[in-house]
Amino acid sequence: MRWLLPLSRTVTLAVVRLRRGICGLGMFYAVRRGRRTGVFLSWSECKAQVDRFPAARFKKFATEDEAWAFVRSSSSPDGSKGQESAHEQKSQAKTSKRPREPLGEGEELPEPGPKHTRQDTEPAAVVSKDTFSYMGESVIVYTDGCCSSNGRKRARAGIGVYWGPGHPLNVGIRLPGRQTNQRAEIHAACKAIMQAKAQNISKLVLYTDSMFTINGITNWVQGWKKNGWRTSTGKDVINKEDFMELDELTQGMDIQWMHIPGHSGFVGNEEADRLAREGAKQSED
């Protein structure tokens, strides 16, 4: 009869774990992509696997079977309920924000869908707040600009803004005006902020691989304005009009400017770059 004891304990444990989810005494946290994948019984355990992990995928379930099905599948299990949180963020970013705990019964965020080409540039209708990814209370967005033959007569520049997989606000368009890489980076950020304001979003975490844009808007612009839009050496600011527009757009916004290495495998940055390159192929209006 001794051999029955381990089996009895195993069965009892399985029943207890199942009851934890059903009775609301606990939930099952499934991590599909993180430092460790699997099913965890507490948010703190789950958070340790996904916090600051690029493109982490995790979701909360009421039953262990559903949780494991999510871990093993490439898309959400049919009929499953929960809320997945997708954080495509730079792992070495210095910020006090942390991924939020999934809120329980709700729809899973979509997996990456077909790649989008140019989006309608008309003002977008207000979209559900649930379609965005968050870092704390701030909405996450990735921007990028590109320019082929930069500095030459045949230069073609585009801007890309990426809000998430299959998001209706994802956009890739041709840069109007002077075709340069730096202008494209600045105006990609401008486009993202304009879109955010149209959605009544006031808090952003904006990822860009352009330190020029970040330094310009967070450090240099105040000195330029004091000097009559001249550099510390007395020269005219080359991208004066572009930074003036960006500076005006940031008023009333709470923006965390985050640098992310370009072409380093971070999904959000790669998608923003793809959109920018598609935009550069378009004709100028």
Curated annotation (Swiss-Prot):
**Cofactor mode of binding and number, as noted:** Binds 1 Mg(2+) ion per subunit. May bind a second metal ion at a regulatory site, or after substrate binding.
Asked whether the UniProt record includes Metal-binding among its keywords, one would answer yes
Q: Which family does it belong to?
A: Belongs to the RNase H family.
Q: How is activity regulated here?
A: In the presence of magnesium, manganese is inhibitory.
Binding-site list for Mg(2+) 1? D144, E185, D209
State the function annotated in the UniProt record: Endonuclease that specifically degrades the RNA of RNA-DNA hybrids. Plays a role in RNA polymerase II (RNAp II) transcription termination by degrading R-loop RNA-DNA hybrid formation at G-rich pause sites located downstream of the poly(A) site and behind the elongating RNAp II.
Disordered as annotated region, ranges: 72-126
Which SUPFAM superfamilies does the entry link to? L9 N-domain-like, Ribonuclease H-like
* Documented EC number(s): 3.1.26.4
Q: Does the keyword Protease apply?
A: no
Q: What catalytic activity does the UniProt entry give for this protein?
A: Endonucleolytic cleavage to 5'-phosphomonoester
Provide the alphabetized UniProt keywords: Cytoplasm, Endonuclease, Hydrolase, Magnesium, Metal-binding, Nuclease
Any idea what this protein is called? Ribonuclease H1
Q: Where does Mg(2+) 2 bind?
A: D144, D273
Question: Which cofactor names does the annotation list?
Answer: Mg(2+)
**Summary of subunit composition and partner proteins:** Monomer.
Its annotated compartments are: Cytoplasm
